[in-house]
């Protein structure tokens, strides 16, 4: 079976990860916006608003890349959730880290003598959201986070790196 480059079959059975930018290229912006309009996350309106309104523009500008997660529901692929990744620079003051932690950070970071801090680049999981418009839920939060982490591992296999950054709310 020949697959489009925009779609990767994931190791976790039943999920397909689709890069939003490639989806827009394939089916067009209007059809993509229609698809995204079916996403609902009443627990966090920012997560819903980002996907519906900002994700395509962020993708075009290269600020963040969004990955849509689809699962089979009643015989068709349905949007189960998404995650967005961006590149983040993390600054760690040298007086905060000691001993072995300092040695570990020193292997992966650049030390800024003037600022007396370490700077390291890490992928940021900037957005993570489940689609509550579909009952029952097609993906758990743990599965969604695992998919995002697998994607980061794949990226770091090519680019290097050992850290990831997650912004979250309880």
Predicted regions and their residues:
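Non-catalytic substrate-recognition and accessory regions of acyl/acetyltransferase enzymes
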Residues: 1-136, 143-169
């Amino acid at each position: 079976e020949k697959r489009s480059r925009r779609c990767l079959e994931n190791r976790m059975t039943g999920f397909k990860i689709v890069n939003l930018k490639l989806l827009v290229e394939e089916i067009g912006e209007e059809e993509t916006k229609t698809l995204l309009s079916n996403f609902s996350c009443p627990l966090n309106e920012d997560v819903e608003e980002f996907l519906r309104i900002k994700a395509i523009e962020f993708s075009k500008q290269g600020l963040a890349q969004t990955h849509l997660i689809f699962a089979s529901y009643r015989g068709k692929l349905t949007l189960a959730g998404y995650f967005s990744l961006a590149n983040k620079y993390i600054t760690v003051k040298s007086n905060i880290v000691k001993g072995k932690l300092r040695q570990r950070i020193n292997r992966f970071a650049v030390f800024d003598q003037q600022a007396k801090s370490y700077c390291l680049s890490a992928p940021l999981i900037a957005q993570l959201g489940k689609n509550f418009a579909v009952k029952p839920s097609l993906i758990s939060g743990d599965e969604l986070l695992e998919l995002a982490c697998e994607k980061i591992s794949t990226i770091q296999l090519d680019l290097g790196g050992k850290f990831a950054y997650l912004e979250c709310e309880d």
